[in-house]
């Protein structure tokens, strides 16, 4: 089962992601939502996600800082950085710390593909 944690400060984006992920027929299911990195870190142990969809720009901890913290506790946790602000430097840093995929927020098909691939691989 692809238990998914969504982390995004925009309520509309969390709703869109929830509908998209829960409508997938590949065993994906949203088990938690957080509005910032601090909430995600606190929530992770309660919902034990198989995969995390994480915004890059949020108040407080950035997506990369949040990913770094989550991966310190669980190095094999698949994280997808999903943002409108991904450039080569962000992508390189994400890769360096262990983020599995970086997907532009406009690329819904790419997000679904990444979630399917990462869920199948785990």
Could you describe each region identified by the protein language model?
Residues 11-32:
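Two-component/phosphorelay signaling modules centered on CheY-like receiver
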Residues 47-53:
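Active-site beta3 strand of CheY-like receiver
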Residues 65, 85-104, 109-113:
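Alpha4 helix (beta4-alpha4-beta5 surface) of REC/receiver domains from two-component response regulators
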Residues 36-39, 62-65:
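Acidic catalytic/metal-coordinating carboxylates
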Residues 7-8, 34, 52:
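Conserved sequence signature across two-component system core domains
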Residues 64-75:
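Short amphipathic alpha-helix used as the core "switch/output" element in two-component signaling
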């Amino acid at each position: 089962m692809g238990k998914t944690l969504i982390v995004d400060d925009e309520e509309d984006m969390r709703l869109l992601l929830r509908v998209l992920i829960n409508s997938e027929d590949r065993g994906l299911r949203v088990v938690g939502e957080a509005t910032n990195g601090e909430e995600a870190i606190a929530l992770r142990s309660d919902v034990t996600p198989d995969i995390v969809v994480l915004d890059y720009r949020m108040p407080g901890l950035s997506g990369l800082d949040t990913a770094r913290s989550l991966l310190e506790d669980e190095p094999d946790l698949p994280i997808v950085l999903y943002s409108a602000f991904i450039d080569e430097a962000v992508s390189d840093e994400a890769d360096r710390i262990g983020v599995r995929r970086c997907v532009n927020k406009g690329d819904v098909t790419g997000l679904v593909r990444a979630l399917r691939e990462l869920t199948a691989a785990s």
